[in-house]
Regions:
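Multi-pass alpha-helical transmembrane bundles in non-GPCR membrane proteins
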Residues: 3-205
Length: 206
């Protein structure tokens, strides 16, 4: 019995030592800064949404986006800032699951504000990404591998599914006088994919 307990203790120690102290501090501070910037940006976005052409739709979509974004940053900050133990392992699952919510939340304004009347593209992609996000979030509470390639592929697939509607997205953004937003979206997606590739590699960067 003692040996079993000792082995379990060593297992928990290994599971909770994925990052060294420098990496944990860097992750905690960077995601904490994301919370602060997200709250500030959220206030600005909500104010603009309320003063826009379709204020009810705009405020609702921005609220969903902020929920997804902040849930990701809050869960990651809490996870990396917590002490090793069972709580940290639970927070790790929330951290991974919240990425799905972040991706789906980011899609919401583009699908329901920009492409809501684009022949079914808006509602179709909205339904797909949110169904994927809910399923992904639930599955995140299964036992996670240290670097799950399947999980990374799911993140990238969700993020890239907008490519099937690239033409209607560009056209509707242009009609709204927001053409440059398309390139910001592409830049953000490319940055995310590059980051996902680096994350999936079993390499220490410190």
């Amino acid at each position: 019995m003692y040996l079993c307990g000792s082995n379990q203790s060593r297992k928990e120690t290994l599971e909770n030592k994925r990052y060294n102290n420098v990496e944990e501090w860097a992750n905690t501070l960077s995601h904490g800064a994301g919370i602060l910037l997200g709250v500030i940006a959220g206030y600005v976005l909500l104010a603009k949404a309320a003063a826009g052409v379709e204020p009810k739709w705009a405020v609702a979509c921005v609220t969903v986006y902020l929920f997804g974004m902040l849930s990701s940053y809050v869960s990651s900050t809490w996870y990396h800032g917590s002490r090793p133990g069972k709580l940290k392992e639970l927070l790790r699952k929330f951290d991974h699951g919240a990425i799905y919510l972040h991706i789906a939340g980011t899609y919401t304004p583009f699908t329901l504000l920009v492409m809501r009347h684009a022949g079914g593209w808006g509602w179709g992609i909205f339904s797909f990404v949110w169904l994927s996000a809910i399923v992904g979030f639930i599955l995140s509470f299964k036992k996670l591998k240290e670097h799950s390639n399947l999980e990374t592929i799911c993140y990238i697939a969700m993020g890239a599914c907008i490519l099937v509607a690239m033409k209607p997205l560009m056209d509707h953004l242009a009609e709204m006088g927001a053409g440059p937003a398309f390139w910001w979206l592409i830049g953000g997606g490319a940055s995310y994919i590059i980051g996902a590739v680096f994350y999936s590699l079993p390499v220490s960067y410190t």
